[in-house]
Amino acid sequence: MTSQPLRVGIGGPVGSGKTALTLALCRELRERYNLAVVTNDIYTQEDAQFLVRNEALAPERIIGVETGGCPHTAIREDASINLEAVDQLNRRFPGLELILVESGGDNLSATFSPELSDLTLYVIDVSAGDKIPRKGGPGICKSDLLVINKIDLAPLVGASLEVMDEDARRMRGDKPFVFSNQKTGQGLAEIIAFIERQGLLTAA
């Protein structure tokens, strides 16, 4: 039986840094794994085009899904459009090891269907204020890894990383989280280590 690729869902609100994280992961992992990406946008393929422009992967390894309406539905209640994209990539690239599925920007209640994602990363950003972790919601409380992004902006918006740390621990219990800054690469190594460890990936 052919083994199925690990599917990693990357969710979070609009502008939190999901696409920047997806790009960084592609650049770091494309030499190690047989890798592809599915992106979700409501009415365009902007995120997919951004990844292609920045040469994250070969264009044929990136599929942009236009969800229409609510992006939450396309990753949860009716994930068929995304599942079809995953199947298409599996057919196109036999031996695929890893597929990153980036959701469209959504609210704190968004979660991935277990049919679509084996591991979930949820990205929030400091610029939205240090109260975000304590607001809870499935993404913050139940994702496999919470990524608190854009920590360089904390002084500019008056956000306390200490408060965010305390609240994330309280809301998530034993579930891990990481502070990151995609501009400098801070936190990226921890995110990759988490994906490899939890997804049982072994680099070629």
Curated annotation (Swiss-Prot):
Chain positions recorded as GTP binding sites: G12, P13, V14, G15, S16, G17, K18, T19
Entry GO terms, CC: cytoplasm
Biological processes, Gene Ontology terms: urea catabolic process
SUPFAM superfamilies: P-loop containing nucleoside triphosphate hydrolases
A molecular function (GO) term: GTPase activity
Pfam families per UniProt: cobW (PF02492)
Keyword hit for Transcription: no
Compartment(s): Cytoplasm
Organism superkingdom: Bacteria
TM regions (residue ranges): none
PANTHER family xref list: UREASE ACCESSORY PROTEIN G (PTHR31715:SF0)
Family, per entry: Belongs to the SIMIBI class G3E GTPase family. UreG subfamily.
Function: Facilitates the functional incorporation of the urease nickel metallocenter. This process requires GTP hydrolysis, probably effectuated by UreG.
UniProt subunit comment: Homodimer. UreD, UreF and UreG form a complex that acts as a GTP-hydrolysis-dependent molecular chaperone, activating the urease apoprotein by helping to assemble the nickel containing metallocenter of UreC. The UreE protein probably delivers the nickel.
Name of the featured protein: Urease accessory protein UreG
